[in-house]
C-alpha cells in the first residue's frame, strides 16, 4: 500500500484473516490426502499399552526392566519416524514462543490458540491437555535420525553386533559423539522448529551446545540418560519452568485440566464465571434428593409462577405492564397445578444437578418436560420459561449450600451422640434440622451455632480429642456465660417456666396452642433472694442474670431468628438520614437527591429496583445513614405473639408478677436482639437483591444487542454475511486522517486505506474508486466526536456520486422544468431509480470496537494498523456478526456499559457471571457450524458459550479437531473421544456439521463414516428417529420402503424437495404428540414443531434484523449527550463560532452545533435585534435554552430570550421522583438552609487577600479541586472559630486532606494571624510560606513515593502482592499506595506467603510530613530510608515475637499456645508475658488480674479468652 495519503491498495493484495492468521492448516491437510492426514493424526495418540506397561515394571527385576525399556524405545523410534514428515517437531508455536520469551529472544507474540497435546500418563481425557513431559519429549524426537523405518532396524541390528566388544568407556564416548552429531543436525534443520538459523546461532552462543554438562547426564554406572530417561528423570511440571501467572492466564493449571477432562459442563464446575481471572472451582458433591429440594425451590422461582400456581400477589398484578404492552391480557391462575409444577421443578433439578444438563439444552430440547398437554393436545401449560430455568439452577445451588451446611451440623451431632451414648434431642433433629434450618442459609448456619451453644462443653472436648491443628473458631458464649449456665442461677431460670424449644415451636405455628407455663409459689424477687450471695449481691441482680440467660437461649434459636427476618422482610421500613456533610453536598442536582429525605419506605418496594445500591454507596461516602424500623403497632403485634407463647394463663398476684417478668424478657429479646439482627440481615439482603436486579437488566440489554442477524441490505438473502467498509475520523482533529478498512464476506481484511479529507476532490475520487473496486454491501461509520457528522455528510456525497455513475444518468436540473412541482416530481422519480445503486451508510454500536482498538490483542494482530484503523476494523466486525464481536471480548465484556448509572455499583464478578449467561443463551439460540468455527480463530470465541462447554473445554475441542481433521458427522464427537456422554448430550444439538446435501451418497453400512443430513440441522441426535419418521410420513413411504436404506436417506430426499414445507405442513403434529404421550413417550409437541421448522429451513437465522441505533443513541455514542442533557427546555452554554445577520452558529461543549435564530434573541417587549453580528462576537459564551433538538443533524436550536430562560431547567434527574421523600423534612431542611444563609448574610464575610482564598465548605472545596492537580489547594474559612482557617489540598484522585490551621498573634478578628500553626508543631509566617513549605513539600513526598517501583495504585496493590508471592514462592513482598481512607497517609502493605497458604496482607500506616515520612516513631527523609526503616522495624517485631513464643506475623500473627487457643486481639499483649504462669490445668489470667490459686478458674473479664 502506498504511503501517499489517500492511496488505496492496488490489486487484490494479501489475504489477511481475522486475528492475523491465514486459513487453518487443517483445511490444507484435508485437501492434500485424507488417508495420510488420518495416519498422521493417529500418531498423536499414545498407546494405552505404554501406560499399562509402566505400571507393571515395578514388580520386575532390574534386567527385565532394562530390556523392556530398550524394546519400548525402539518401538517409539519407529513410530516417530513414521509421522515425522508431517509433524511440526511436536513443539507447538505457543510453547516455542513461550520458551523464547523466557530466554529473552522474543519481545512479544501474537495471541494464538493453545495447542493441547497428549500426555504419557493418566486417562484418555488427560491426554487432551499439554504436559511438560510432552514438550521435552519433542526435543528428543527432533534429534532422531531422518532415515526410514527399514534402515533404522538395520542400523540397530548392526549396532548391537558391532558394539558387542567395546568397553564401557568407549561406549560412553560413542554416545557423546552421537549426541553431538544430532545437535549439529538440529542446527542444520532449524525449519523443523520454525526458528531461523541466526536465532539458533544466538541461542547456542548464549547457552552453549550443552556439552559442558554432559557429565551430569550420565548415571552412576556410566549409562547415559538416553537409556535411563524414564527411570531417572524427575517429573517436571509447567510451574517449575514457566511463570504461574502465564500458566493461569492460559488456563493450564491442574484445576483447569481437571475441568476440561471431566464429563460435566464447565459452568457446573465453576462457581463464578468461567471467564473470571479468579475462578472458584466447585466440588462435585452428591446433590440432595431433588423432590425435597423442589419443595424449597418451587415457591421462590418467579413472580409469574407464584401468581399462577401459588395464588400469591394481588389479582391482576400479572402480567406486569410494559412499554411494549401497557395493557396485557390477564391470565388465569392455576393453583390446581401446584403439585404438577413442583414435579416439573423437581425434574429440572434432577436434570441439572444429577444428570448435569445445562439450561440451554433443557430449554431447547427438553422444554416439553416442563409443560403439560391439555384438551387432547390442543393446548399446553408451560411451567418453566427459560429465565425461570436459570433461576431454578441458582436456587438449586443455594439449596445445596443449605443442605451441606446442615449435613455438617448433623455430623457434629453424630459425634456428640457417639460421645454421650443415649442422648436424644428431638427438637434439634426434627424441629431445627428438619424444618427451621432449611429455610435459609442463615438459618442453617444458626443451627450450627445453636448446637455449639447448647453442647459447648461436648464440642470442646471432641475438638481436643481430635487434636485439631488449626485454631478453632470462637464458640459462642463459652466463657462467662457458659459458666453462668452451669451455676445455681439455672434453677431460677427454670422457675420462669419457659422452655425455649417449646416457645420456638409455638411461635412458628401462628394458629397453634402454646404449651402451658407453670408459675412458682413465690414472687419473682422473693424467689430470686434465695440465689443471692457472692455472685449476686441483690435479688434484682439474680433475677436480671436469669433473665439474661433466658434471653440468650431464645435469641439463639434459629426458628425464632428466621421469624424475625421474615417479619422484617415483610413489614420493614427504610428511612434515610443525611449527615451534616450530606446535607450540604447532596443538592437538587445530585444523583442522591431522590432519596435524601426518604422516610418509611417499605422494604417490599425495593424489589425490582436498583435504588438501594445507590443508598449504600451514599452511606459509604459518609453522606447518609440508613435506618430500618417497623411501625409501632406491627412491632407490638410481633412482640405480643412471642409473649403469648411465654406467658401463663393463671390468675393471681404471683402469676401476674411472673408474667410481667416474662414480658420484659420478650421485649428485651425483640428490641435488643432480634430486630438489630434482622436489620443487619435485611441490609445485606436488599443489597444482594438490587445487585441481582442490575446484573439481570444488563444481561437483558446484552441479549437485545447480540440477538440480531448480521446487517443485510434489501438485496441480500437471509443468512448472508455482508462485505463491509468501515470508515472513521477518530476524534475529528485536524491531525486525524480518515481510516477505511474493508472486510470481505468471509471476514478477511481486504483493504486498509487512509484519506486526508473526503471533502477534497482527490480523496473523494479515490474513495469512489474504492467503492467501485471492492463493492461493499454496507458502509459503517463511527467516531469519538461530533465531527463524525461531517464525515458522514462527506461520505454520503461520495456514495451518491458513485451511485450516479453506476446508474449512468445525471440528476434532473431545475432549469429544465417550467415549475418547481415538476422538478420535485422528476427528482423523486430519479431518487427512486438511484436507490437501487446506493450503498447504505449506517452507524453501529461501537462499544466492542472501542475496547478492541486499544487492546493488546488488536496490536498483536494488526501492528501496522493505527488506533483508528483498529477501531474501524472493530466496527466492520460488529456489522458482520454482533454476537461474535461481543463473544470476542471475553472477560472484558464487563467493561461495556449496559446500565449507565447502576452498573458500576455492583461487583464485576457478579456482572460477568450474568453477562456470560446472556452470551450462552444467544450462542445456543443460533448454534455454530463446528468445522468453520475451528478453522477461523475469530469465530472460535463463540465456542465456549455452547451449552456444556467453556473456555477450557473449548480449547480441548479445538485441539482435538485440529489433530484429527474436520468432522464428518456428530458421531465423531464421541468416536474421537472429544466428548463424554454427558457433554455430548448437552452440546450436540448446538454444533452443526455442514455438508453438500446434493452430493451425499448415503449407504446403510458404516454410518459413522458418512455425513448425515440431520447433522446440518439443530435437531438433537436423540430426536433423529422422530425426524426420520416424520420425513417418512411426509413422503408417504412405508416402513418396508426404507428398511434397507440409510436411516436419514428419507431426510435427504425431503430436504431436497422444494415442496417440503407443504408436505410437512400436512402432518397433524397435535395428534402425533398426543399419541406419543399416551404411549409413554412423554410430551413431545414442542420438539415435533422444532423438527418441522428445521427440516423446512435448516439452521435458518430466526433472530430479529440487525439493529441500527436511533438518532439519539448515535448522538450519545459519539458525543455523550442525551435527551436528559440537551433535550427540549434544558439550559445550555454555547460558544459563538460565527454570527451573521439572521442567525448565530454556536457550538456546545460536547461539540454539537447550536443555531440561534434572530427571532429568538430577545423578547417582544425588548428592543428588536436587527442583525445578530452586532450583538454576538466569535468565541463569546452565551446562555441559552434548547427549543428544538435535532439529533439527526447533530445540532440543537436554542433561544436566549429571557422568558425562555426563566422557563428552562438546569438539570433533569436521571431517576424518577420518590414518593416516600418526605416533603415536611425537605421543607424543614430548606428552611434551615435559608436561615443559615440569612445569618451568614448578616455577618461580615471574612475575606483574606490571597488568590487561593475561597469561601467554600469542605465538600465544595473538594468539588473545586476535583479537576486540578496534586498539591493544588484551597484556603477557606474554618467552622472552628475566627482564630482558625482551613486548607484543603488534593492528595490524589478523590483524596483530599483538610488541614486545620491555627492563627496566632491576630491584630483583629478579621485579619490573618502573624503566625500560622499546623498540628501544634509547624509554624509559618504567611499563607505562601504555608503553601510552599507545608502543602507543596508534602505533595512532593507523594510524588516521590509514586516514582518508586514498589508503588501501586490502591486498588491494584493487593493483587500485585498476591501475584508476586504466587510467582515467587518463598519470597516476601511489600508495596506502597495512597491511603484513601486517611488522607495524608500512605499504606505500606506486605505479604510473606500466598493467601492460599494462609498468608495475610498486613498494612502499616505511613504519615507523610513536609519533606519526610513517618513510620512508627521513625522519621526519614526519603523512600529508601523508609524502606530500610520498615525492614528494621519488621525485624524487631519478629525478634520480639520470637521471644514471646509467637508465630512471626506482624499484628495479625497467631500464637498457637495450645489446642484450640486463640491469638489476642489486635494491639493486645500476650497474656503470659509479664504475668505469673498459671498452675497446670488452669487458664491464663486476664490482664490486670491476679494469678488464681491452684485449680481455680481464671477471672473472665478484662483479658483475651483462650
Curated annotation (Swiss-Prot):
It is found in: Nucleus; Chromosome. Residues 66-81 have a biased composition (Basic residues). Its main location: nucleus. It comes from the Eukaryota. Residues 1239-1349 form the SH2 domain. Residues 1-194, 1460-1506 are annotated as: Disordered. One of its GO terms (molecular function) is DNA binding. This is Transcription elongation factor SPT6.
Amino acid at each position: 500500500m502506498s504511503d501517499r495519503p489517500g492511496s488505496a491498495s492496488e490489486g487484490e493484495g494479501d489475504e489477511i484473516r481475522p486475528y492475523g492468521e491465514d486459513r487453518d492448516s487443517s483445511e490444507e491437510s484435508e485437501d492434500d490426502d485424507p488417508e495420510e492426514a488420518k495416519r498422521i493424526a493417529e500418531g498423536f495418540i499414545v498407546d494405552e499399552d505404554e501406560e499399562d506397561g509402566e505400571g507393571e515394571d515395578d514388580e520386575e527385576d532390574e534386567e527385565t526392566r532394562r530390556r523392556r525399556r530398550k524394546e519400548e524405545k525402539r518401538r517409539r523410534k519407529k513410530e516417530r519416524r513414521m509421522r515425522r514428515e508431517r509433524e511440526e517437531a511436536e513443539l507447538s508455536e505457543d510453547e516455542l514462543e513461550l520458551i523464547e520469551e523466557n530466554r529473552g529472544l522474543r519481545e512479544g507474540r501474537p495471541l494464538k490458540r493453545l495447542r493441547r497435546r497428549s500426555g504419557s500418563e493418566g486417562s484418555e481425557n488427560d491426554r487432551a491437555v499439554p504436559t511438560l513431559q510432552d514438550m521435552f519429549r519433542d526435543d528428543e524426537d527432533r534429534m532422531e535420525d531422518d532415515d526410514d523405518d527399514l534402515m533404522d532396524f538395520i542400523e540397530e541390528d548392526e549396532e548391537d553386533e558391532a558394539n558387542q566388544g567395546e568397553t564401557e568407556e568407549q561406549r560412553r564416548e560413542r554416545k557423546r559423539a552421537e549426541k553431538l552429531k544430532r545437535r549439529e543436525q538440529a542446527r542444520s534443520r532449524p525449519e523443523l522448529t520454525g526458528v531461523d538459523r541466526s536465532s539458533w546461532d544466538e541461542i547456542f552462543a548464549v547457552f552453549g551446545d550443552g556439552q559442558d554438562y554432559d557429565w551430569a547426564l550420565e548415571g552412576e554406572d556410566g549409562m547415559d540418560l538416553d537409556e535411563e530417561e524414564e527411570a531417572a528423570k524427575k517429573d517436571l511440571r509447567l510451574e517449575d519452568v514457566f511463570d504461574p501467572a502465564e500458566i493461569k492466564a492460559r488456563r493450564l493449571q491442574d484445576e483447569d485440566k481437571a475441568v476440561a477432562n471431566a464429563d460435566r459442563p464447565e459452568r457446573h464446575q465453576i462457581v463464578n464465571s468461567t471467564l473470571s481471572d479468579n475462578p472458584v472451582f466447585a466440588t462435585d458433591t452428591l446433590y440432595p434428593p431433588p423432590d425435597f429440594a423442589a419443595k424449597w425451590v418451587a415457591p421462590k422461582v418467579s413472580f409469574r409462577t407464584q401468581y399462577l400456581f401459588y395464588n400469591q400477589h394481588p389479582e391482576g398484578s400479572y402480567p406486569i405492564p410494559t412499554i411494549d404492552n401497557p395493557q396485557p391480557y390477564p391470565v388465569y391462575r392455576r393453583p390446581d397445578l401446584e403439585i404438577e409444577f413442583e414435579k416439573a421443578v423437581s425434574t429440572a433439578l434432577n436434570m441439572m444437578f444429577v444428570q448435569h444438563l445445562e439450561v440451554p439444552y433443557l430449554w431447547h430440547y427438553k422444554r416439553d418436560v416442563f409443560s403439560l398437554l391439555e384438551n387432547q393436545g390442543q393446548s399446553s401449560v408451560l411451567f418453566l420459561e427459560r429465565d425461570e430455568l436459570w433461576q431454578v439452577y441458582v436456587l438449586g445451588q443455594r439449596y445445596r449450600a443449605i443442605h451441606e451446611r446442615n449435613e455438617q451440623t448433623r455430623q457434629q451431632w453424630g459425634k456428640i451422640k457417639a460421645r454421650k451414648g443415649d442422648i436424644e434431642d428431638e427438637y434439634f433433629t426434627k424441629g431445627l434440622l428438619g424444618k427451621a434450618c432449611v429455610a435459609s442459609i442463615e438459618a442453617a448456619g444458626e443451627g450450627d451455632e445453636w448446637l455449639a451453644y447448647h453442647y459447648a462443653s461436648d464440642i470442646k472436648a471432641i475438638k481436643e480429642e481430635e487434636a485439631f491443628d488449626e485454631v478453632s473458631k470462637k464458640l459462642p458464649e463459652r466463657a462467662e456465660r457458659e459458666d453462668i449456665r452451669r451455676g445455681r442461677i439455672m434453677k431460677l431460670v427454670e422457675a420462669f417456666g419457659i422452655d425455649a424449644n417449646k416457645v420456638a415451636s409455638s411461635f412458628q405455628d401462628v394458629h397453634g396452642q402454646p404449651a402451658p407455663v407453670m408459675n412458682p409459689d413465690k414472687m419473682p424477687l422473693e424467689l430470686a433472694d434465695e440465689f443471692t450471695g457472692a455472685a449476686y449481691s441483690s435479688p434484682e441482680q439474680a433475677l436480671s442474670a436469669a433473665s439474661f440467660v433466658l434471653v440468650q437461649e431464645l435469641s439463639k434459636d434459629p426458628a425464632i431468628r428466621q421469624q424475625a427476618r421474615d417479619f422484617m422482610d415483610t413489614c420493614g421500613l427504610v428511612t434515610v438520614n443525611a449527615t451534616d456533610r450530606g446535607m450540604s453536598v447532596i443538592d437538587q442536582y445530585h444523583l442522591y437527591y431522590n432519596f435524601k429525605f426518604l422516610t418509611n419506605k417499605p422494604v417490599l418496594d425495593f424489589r425490582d429496583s436498583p435504588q438501594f445500591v445507590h443508598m449504600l454507596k451514599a452511606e459509604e461516602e459518609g453522606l447518609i445513614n440508613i435506618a430500618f424500623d417497623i411501625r409501632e403497632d406491627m412491632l407490638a403485634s410481633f412482640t405480643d405473639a412471642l409473649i403469648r407463647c411465654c406467658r401463663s394463663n393463671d390468675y393471681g398476684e404471683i402469676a401476674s408478677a411472673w408474667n410481667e417478668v416474662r414480658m420484659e424478657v420478650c421485649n428485651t429479646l425483640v428490641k435488643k436482639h432480634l430486630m438489630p439482627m434482622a436489620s443487619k440481615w435485611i441490609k445485606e439482603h436488599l443489597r444482594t437483591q438490587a445487585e441481582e436486579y442490575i446484573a439481570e437488566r444488563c444481561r437483558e440489554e446484552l441479549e437485545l444487542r447480540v440477538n440480531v442477524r448480521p446487517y443485510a441490505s434489501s438485496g441480500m438473502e437471509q443468512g448472508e454475511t455482508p462485505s463491509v467498509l468501515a470508515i472513521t475520523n477518530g476524534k475529528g482533529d485536524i491531525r486525524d486522517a480518515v481510516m477505511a478498512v474493508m472486510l470481505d464476506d468471509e471476514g478477511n481484511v481486504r483493504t486498509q486505506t487512509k484519506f486526508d479529507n473526503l471533502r477534497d476532490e482527490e480523496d473523494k475520487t479515490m474513495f469512489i474508486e474504492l467503492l467501485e473496486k471492492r463493492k461493499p454491501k454496507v458502509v459503517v461509520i463511527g467516531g469519538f466526536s461530533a465531527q463524525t457528522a461531517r464525515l458522514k455528510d462527506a461520505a454520503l456525497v461520495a456514495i451518491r456520486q458513485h451511485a450516479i455513475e453506476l446508474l449512468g444518468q445525471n440528476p434532473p436540473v431545475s432549469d429544465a422544468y417550467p415549475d418547481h412541482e415538476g422538478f420535485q416530481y422528476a427528482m423523486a422519480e430519479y431518487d427512486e431509480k438511484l436507490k437501487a445503486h446506493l450503498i447504505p451508510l449506517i452507524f453501529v454500536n461501537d462499544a466492542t470496537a472501542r475496547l478492541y482498538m486499544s487492546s493488546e490483542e488488536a496490536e498483536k494482530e494488526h501492528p501496522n494498523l493505527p488506533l483508528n484503523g483498529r477501531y474501524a476494523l472493530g466496527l466492520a466486525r460488529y456489522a458482520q456478526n454482533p454476537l461474535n464481536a461481543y463473544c470476542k471480548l471475553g472477560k472484558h465484556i464487563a467493561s461495556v456499559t449496559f446500565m449507565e448509572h447502576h452498573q458500576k455499583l455492583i461487583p464485576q464478578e457478579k456482572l460477568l457471571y450474568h453477562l456470560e449467561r446472556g452470551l450462552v443463551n444467544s450462542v445456543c439460540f443460533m448454534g455454530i457450524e463446528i468445522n468453520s468455527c475451528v478453522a477461523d480463530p475469530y469465530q472460535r470465541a463463540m465456542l465456549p458459550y455452547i451449552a456444556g462447554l467453556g473456555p477450557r473445554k473449548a480449547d480441548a475441542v479445538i485441539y482435538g479437531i485440529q489433530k484429527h481433521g474436520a468432522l464428518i458427522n456428530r458421531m465423531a464427537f464421541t468416536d474421537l473421544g472429544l466428548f463424554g456422554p454427558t457433554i455430548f448430550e448437552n452440546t450436540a444439538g448446538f454444533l452443526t456439521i455442514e455438508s453438500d446435501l446434493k452430493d451425499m451418497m448415503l449407504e446403510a453400512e458404516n454410518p459413522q463414516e458418512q455425513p448425515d443430513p440431520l447433522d446440518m440441522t439443530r435437531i438433537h441426535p436423540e430426536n433423529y428417529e422422530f425426524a426420520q419418521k416424520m420425513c417418512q410420513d411426509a413422503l408417504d413411504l412405508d416402513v418396508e420402503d426404507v428398511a434397507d436404506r440409510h436411516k436419514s436417506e428419507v431426510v435427504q430426499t425431503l430436504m431436497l424437495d422444494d415442496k417440503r414445507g407443504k408436505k410437512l405442513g400436512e402432518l397433524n403434529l397435535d395428534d402425533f404428540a398426543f399419541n406419543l404421550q399416551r404411549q409413554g413417550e412423554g410430551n413431545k409437541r414442542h420438539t415435533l414443531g422444532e423438527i418441522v421448522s428445521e427440516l423446512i429451513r435448516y439452521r435458518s437465522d430466526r433472530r430479529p434484523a440487525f439493529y441500527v441505533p436511533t438518532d439519539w443513541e448515535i448522538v450519545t455514542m459519539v458525543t455523550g449527550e442525551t435527551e436528559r442533557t440537551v433535550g427540549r427546555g434544558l439550559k445550555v452554554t454555547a460558544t459563538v463560532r460565527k454570527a451573521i445577520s439572521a442567525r448565530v452558529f454556536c457550538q456546545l461543549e460536547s461539540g454539537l452545533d447550536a443555531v440561534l435564530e434572530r427571532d429568538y434573541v430577545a423578547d417582544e417587549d425588548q428592543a428588536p435585534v436587527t442583525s445578530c453580528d452586532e450583538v454576538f462576537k466569535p468565541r463569546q459564551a452565551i446562555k441559552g435554552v434548547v427549543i428544538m433538538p435535532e439529533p439527526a443533524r447533530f445540532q440543537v436550536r436554542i433561544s436566549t430570550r429571557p422568558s425562555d430562560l426563566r422557563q428552562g431547567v438546569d438539570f433533569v434527574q436521571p431517576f424518577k421522583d420518590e414518593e416516600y421523600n418526605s416533603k415536611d423534612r425537605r421543607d424543614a431542611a430548606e428552611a434551615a438552609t435559608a436561615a443559615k444563609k440569612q445569618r451568614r448574610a448578616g455577618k461580615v464575610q471574612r475575606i483574606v487577600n490571597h488568590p487561593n482564598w475561597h469561601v467554600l465548605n469542605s465538600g465544595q472545596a473538594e468539588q473545586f479541586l476535583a479537576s486540578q492537580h496534586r498539591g493544588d489547594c484551597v484556603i477557606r474559612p474554618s467552622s472552628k472559630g475566627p482564630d482558625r482557617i482551613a486548607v484543603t489540598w488534593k492528595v490524589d484522585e478523590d483524596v483530599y486532606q483538610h488541614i486545620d490551621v491555627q492563627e496566632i498573634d491576630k491584630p483583629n478578628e478579621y485579619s490573618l494571624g502573624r503566625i500560622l500553626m499546623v498540628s501544634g508543631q509547624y509554624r509559618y509566617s504567611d499563607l505562601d510560606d504555608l503553601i510552599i513549605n507545608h502543602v507543596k513539600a508534602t505533595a512532593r513526598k507523594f510524588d516521590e513515593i509514586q516514582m518508586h517501583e514498589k508503588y501501586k495504585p490502591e486498588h491494584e496493590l493487593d493483587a500485585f502482592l498476591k501475584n508476586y508471592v504466587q510467582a515467587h514462592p518463598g519470597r516476601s513482598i511489600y508495596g506502597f499506595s495512597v491511603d484513601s481512607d486517611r488522607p495524608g497517609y500512605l499504606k505500606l502493605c506486605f505479604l510473606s506467603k500466598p493467601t492460599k497458604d494462609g498468608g495475610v496482607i498486613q498494612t502499616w500506616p505511613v504519615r507523610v510530613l513536609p519533606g519526610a515520612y513517618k513510620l512508627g516513631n521513625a522519621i526519614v527523609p526519603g523512600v529508601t530510608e523508609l524502606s530500610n526503616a520498615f525492614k528494621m522495624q519488621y525485624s524487631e517485631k519478629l525478634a520480639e515475637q520470637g521471644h514471646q513464643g509467637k508465630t512471626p506475623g506482624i499484628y495479625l500473627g497467631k500464637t498457637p499456645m495450645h489446642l484450640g487457643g486463640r491469638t489476642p486481639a489486635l494491639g493486645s499483649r500476650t497474656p503470659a508475658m509479664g504475668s505469673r504462669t498459671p498452675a497446670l490445668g488452669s487458664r491464663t489470667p486476664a490482664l490486670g488480674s491476679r494469678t488464681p490459686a491452684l485449680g481455680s478458674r481464671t477471672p473472665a473479664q478484662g483479658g483475651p479468652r483462650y
